[in-house]
Amino acid sequence: ATGTKTKAAAPAATTAIATATKDWTTVVSATPEGGFRMGNPNAPVKLLEFASLTCPHCKDFHEEALPTIKAKYIATGKVNYEFRNFVLNGPDFAASMLARCQGPTVFFNLLNAFFVNQAMWTEPFTKLTEADTKRLQALPEDQQIAALAVTGGLDGFMRTRGMPRAKFDQCLADKKAFEQLTRMRTDAVEKYKLTGTPAFIINGETQAETFNWATLQP
């Protein structure tokens, strides 16, 4: 009888060891709500972040906190992390569509690239002339984001990160992707009552007055 119990317990013990030693940061997926998730899907803590790629405070959080969160909490299976875009402006729409269009495996690397290089890639958009603005506004609405992205130099930014121009154009022409970003923003405001970025939801509960690692960390 004792031997039978030992054999029955062995698979569970093996699973526990595998879970403890697995690097969960390598496990990524898309969510039905439009986010991208990293980590153990059965983690006891579900951390959802809404952020904008053009938001300086979001950049600060990702540089200051995400390495610690990944190493200490996500990699060890304690936290499942999901990122959802909360788009704030045209350049944010363009960058978000480009970061998202190749799926979750590529997304997190591009997310990091957009945050780390935020000042560099957003600067050209601050220098658009009145003539640039009029030219963009004269285009059909479904062509404006793509034209804005090219005007701001995002084609070059993505080319140096392995995205050919044909794929760049394809990503920015994806109407469903644009609509999904719009839905996520609406969901953030209506469901979670968010008013700014970054914003955090833990196990379904919005964290009030929490905008940085100092106020979020356990």
Model-predicted regions and their roles:
Residues 1-13, 17, 52, 145-218:
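C-terminal cap of thioredoxin/glutaredoxin-like
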Residues 1-92:
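Extracytoplasmic thiol/disulfide redox context detector
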Residues 7-30, 110-114, 123-127, 145-152:
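Periplasmic c-type cytochrome electron-transfer domains
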Residues 38-43, 82-83, 126, 156-159, ...:
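Short hydrophobic/aromatic-rich motifs at helix boundaries and adjacent loops
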Residues 45-46, 76-80, 105-109, 163-166, ...:
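Loop/turn elements at helix/coil->beta-strand transitions in domains of secreted/extracellular proteins
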Residues 53, 59-146:
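Structural alpha/beta surface segment adjacent to cysteine/selenocysteine redox centers
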